[in-house]
Amino acid sequence: MGLQEHPVTPAERQPPVRGGVTIGVEEEFLLVDAASGQLAPHAEAVLAEAANGPLGAPDAVLHAEMLNSQVEAATGCCRTLEELRSQLVAARTSLDRAASVAGARIVSSGTPVLAVEGTGTSNGQRFADIAERYRAVASDYHVCGCHVHVGVPDRDTAVAVVNHLRPWLPTLLAISANSPFHLGHDTGHASWRGVQQRLYPGSGVPPHFPSRDAYDREVARLVDCGALVDDRMSFWMARPSPHLPTVELRVADALITAEETVLQAALSRALVRAALDDLAAGREGDEVSDQVAAAAVWNASRYGLRGPAVDPVPARRVPALEMVERLLRRVGPALEQTGDSALVREALAHVTGVGTGSERQRAAAAAGGPREVVAMLAAATAPGRADRLRT
C-alpha cells in the first residue's frame, strides 16, 4: 500500500553503486480466514508468531501495513534474481506458517476477492493521521502492491531515471494485473487496485521533473497544500526513494507467485539500467503528456494484457501484447548484461500463455465461485502449502 509506519527496510537499505545492480522488493499480502476466506484482522498476531520462528532470509523484514488485515515482507538487498527469489519464498513461507497458527492464510492479490467486513486500521500515529486525512478513500483501500527498489548512484540520478521510466510504467501494470474483484463483485477491470489508487492525490505516472530540486519542491508543495500527509507519501508509480539512492517502482499489483514477482523485479531493474545507459550517452527520455500517460494507465488497469493499450510516445492505441514486445526490445541489452534474458522471456511467455493474475482469478471463479478463487490464491501464494481452505 505504501503507507508504512516502519523504518527504512532492507529493500531500501542499499549502498551507493554504479547503478542498476542491486534490487530489493516489498510484497504486501492480505490475511484471510482459513475457513471463510474473508479478510482476517490478525496482522499483529501473525507478525508476533512469525517473529518466533525461522525466517530463512536473515536480511528480510516482516511488518504491519495500514490495515490490520495486511502484512508486508521486505527482502534484503539482492544482486541476482535467484537470491531475490530465495528471499521472497522464505518470507512468504514464514508468513503463511505464522498465519496458519492464527487460523488464517496469506493471499497475494491486488484486492480482496470477497466483501470486506470487520477490519480496521493498524496501530500507529502515522496510520491514524492518514486515516483521518483521507477518510473513506483510506478505509476502503484494501489493496496490495509490489514495490521494487533498484540502486542508483544518487538522488539526482534517481529523478532523471524516473523521467525515462514514464512511458513503460503502464505496461508493467498490465503485466502485473491481479485485482479483478472488489467487494465480492467482478469489476470488469484487470487491475481495480490501479483504479482505486488514482483516488489519492499524487498518483499515476509521475510528471517529468527537470531536476532533483524541482521534484522536491513539487512534493513539498503537495504537502503544504494538504494533499499529502508528509514527503514520504507520494503515490506516483515510480519515484526516488525518500531515504536512500534508489528508484522505487510502485506500479505492480501484488503478484500471485514469487516467480511473477521476480519477473516484475527483473523488468524494473532492466528499465533502470536502460535509463542509466541513455543518461550516460546524453539521451533524453521520451516526452509523454500527463493526460496521455493517464490514458495509458487507465487502459492497463481496464484490460491488462487482453485488449488495447496506449503507446504513450506516439499517443495511440495498440494491442497490449505489442507493448510487451516493445518493452522487451527496450530492455533487451540490459537483460543480456545481467544474464537474465532467457529467464525473463520464459516468464513473460508463461504469463501471456496462462494469463495474468486477473485472468487466472476469473478462471477460478468460473470454475468454482469466489471461494475457489481464494483457495487458488492461498495455494499459489505460499509454495509448499497446496492444501485448500478448510470447508
Swiss-Prot record:
EC number(s) stated in the UniProt entry for this protein: 6.3.2.2
Transmembrane segments annotated in the record for this chain: none
One Pfam family here: GCS2
InterPro entries, A to Z: GCL_type2/YbdK_subfam, GCS2, Gln_synth/guanido_kin_cat_dom, YbdK
Domain of life: Bacteria
SUPFAM superfamilies associated with the record: Glutamine synthetase/guanido kinase
GO process terms (BP): modified amino acid biosynthetic process
GO MF terms, alphabetically ordered: ATP binding; glutamate-cysteine ligase activity
Catalytic activity: L-cysteine + L-glutamate + ATP = gamma-L-glutamyl-L-cysteine + ADP + phosphate + H(+)
Keywords linked to the UniProt accession: ATP-binding, Ligase, Nucleotide-binding
Record function comment: ATP-dependent carboxylate-amine ligase which exhibits weak glutamate--cysteine ligase activity.
Annotated family: Belongs to the glutamate--cysteine ligase type 2 family. YbdK subfamily.
UniProt name for this protein: Putative glutamate--cysteine ligase 2-2
Organism: Saccharopolyspora erythraea (strain ATCC 11635 / DSM 40517 / JCM 4748 / NBRC 13426 / NCIMB 8594 / NRRL 2338)
